[in-house]
Curated annotation (Swiss-Prot):
SUPFAM superfamilies: Composite domain of metallo-dependent hydrolases, Metallo-dependent hydrolases. Binds 1 zinc or iron ion per subunit. Pfam families: Amidohydro_1. Pathway: Amino-acid degradation; L-histidine degradation into L-glutamate; N-formimidoyl-L-glutamate from L-histidine: step 3/3. It catalyses: 4-imidazolone-5-propanoate + H2O = N-formimidoyl-L-glutamate. It comes from the Bacteria. GO terms for molecular function: imidazolonepropionase activity; iron ion binding; zinc ion binding. The gene is hutI. NCBIfam families: hutI (TIGR01224). This is Imidazolonepropionase. It comes from Photobacterium profundum (strain SS9). N-formimidoyl-L-glutamate binds at residues 147, 322, 324.
Amino acid sequence: MLTNLRLVTLSSETSADNNGYQIIEDGMVGITNGKIMFVGSVSDSPLACHNDLHGHPDVIDCGNALVTPGLIDCHTHLVFAGNRANEFEQRLNGMPYEEMAKRGGGIISTVQATREATEDELYQLAIKRLNGLKRDGVTTIEIKSGYGLTLDDELKMLRVARRIGDMPDIKVSTTLLAAHAVPPEYKNRADDYIEYVCQHIIPAAVEQGLADYVDVFCEGIGFSTQQCQRVFETAKHYGLGIKGHTEQLSNLGGSALAARMGATSVDHIEHLDHDGVAALAANNTVATLLPGAYYFLRETQRPPIEHLRKLQVPMAISTDFNPGTSPIASLRTMMNMACTFFRLTPEECLRGVTCNAAQALGLEASRGKISVGMEADLALWDIDTPAELSYRLGVPDLVARIVDGELFYAK
């Protein structure tokens, strides 16, 4: 039992305060075999009859910590080799991306470095990046492939992601993103590459149990809606979930396509129109906001937040951690950016990195809320109010994380 805490449950079973948070003061959480078995006040707990709860061997005093669900980073490209700091300098000096690509930069430079790296090297690099997310209270993370673009290299990336998921203090959902870019070997033959993805990479990932989802980059510099539909159809044939990078730079209709085909989420969506929002609402598809990429690329077109609110589309928030457009390993920074750039409320941001992020990964029945029967994934904070998670940056507020019922103190 965890006692002497203030619970932000984000569960409809708990009444909301004036700011929309579901908070239980003087709260207690009971955990058995990694699952939450009791949520409520101390006076209602199974141990309420004990005169001295603090001395009970099964009780941990949390020091009046504020407790939220463990945070979920539902869109990352954590596994890769190399970095593109030189391109950051070049972009600031006015060099267009197209010119960088001609010089061998851009995504292809990351592909080359990732292909050359061993699995152990990729694993060690990813662990260093992951540590920053853990310090922000992250207990579940999604990791994509997409920097291999060959059968062997895409599977190599997914094996690294699965290996990270074997760690006791983090849960990992894996996504095959072979349809991320056209590799050099298939230059000017995007249709042929999509067939290679559908006929070889997806079946192999399924056979080896390496992928939970399949993702695509539906964009003018990526793949067309017809090509993405082919990938989605193949993924669904093999029983995999689908999601999409859509409407980041233009409006091709990829979000509506993905939603109609059953995607759990569509991500970026700066150029999403009202018809696209309606498609998300009709199909219960999560809109994942990626303010880090918006910031890093100095974009000006914001996602249609008001219309998403109007149609009650759940909004998730994620880092989009990647070497080219969002090298920011801090989910709390994304919460602050979502408030500042997109005008989300702190309460919307907290839901965006907990219950809505869980829904984006198809995990809403097991993670993202503090409720009986859910997995015991929690974050304990030394703060007064939940809004501080979005408001304050650079302060080590995390006390501990609990993952599947196991306690890990912040380092």
